[in-house]
């Protein structure tokens, strides 16, 4: 009896965990009316297309079964014709694919170049701003150096004038 109760508790616990997992997967709100209408419209359409593809497959199999004797009788003519048509189709498809690849690569290069030229004024403006800042900084440093030299010259001139008058001998 205790085993049955324990098994029941285990089952309830597992069921609760599964329920929480499912709740985590499912969306919290119901689909909107437009989503429901879309599903209601596309589901039958998808089924119809699936049925039509099955019918096309069945018709192809029946047609192949009926046409096989004709293919065997006319095979000396049909095989070279089929090879010729197959090679022509392969050539056209290859040409189109290579042309599309070339066109897309040229488009990519043109877009890359266009983006590079659009960014160039930003780089030029940034370089111009840095040059102006460097010139202003150099001018400021030059002015400071000029003032320092002027101050030293004034000190030397004042010190030399006062010291020169006291240190020189006059003969009279």
UniProtKB/Swiss-Prot annotation:
Membrane-traversing stretches: 42-62, 70-90, 91-111
N-acetylalanine, modified sites: 2
Compartments (UniProt record): Lipid droplet; Membrane
InterPro entries with a match to the protein in the record: Oleosin
Main location: other
Region (Hydrophobic): 39-110
Chain residue ranges for the region called Disordered: 147-172
GO biological process: lipid storage; response to freezing; seed oilbody biogenesis
Annotated Pfam families: Oleosin
Name used for this protein in its record: Oleosin 18 kDa
Record region (Polar): 2-38
UniProt key word Membrane: yes
Alphabetic keyword roster: Acetylation, Lipid droplet, Membrane, Repeat, Transmembrane, Transmembrane helix
Biased composition (Gly residues): 158-172
Functional description taken from the UniProt entry: May have a structural role to stabilize the lipid body during desiccation of the seed by preventing coalescence of the oil. Probably interacts with both lipid and phospholipid moieties of lipid bodies. May also provide recognition signals for specific lipase anchorage in lipolysis during seedling growth.
Family statement drawn from the similarity comment of this UniProt entry: Belongs to the oleosin family.
GO cellular component terms, semicolon-separated: membrane; monolayer-surrounded lipid storage body
Organism of origin: Oryza sativa subsp. indica
Topology class, membrane: Multi-pass membrane protein
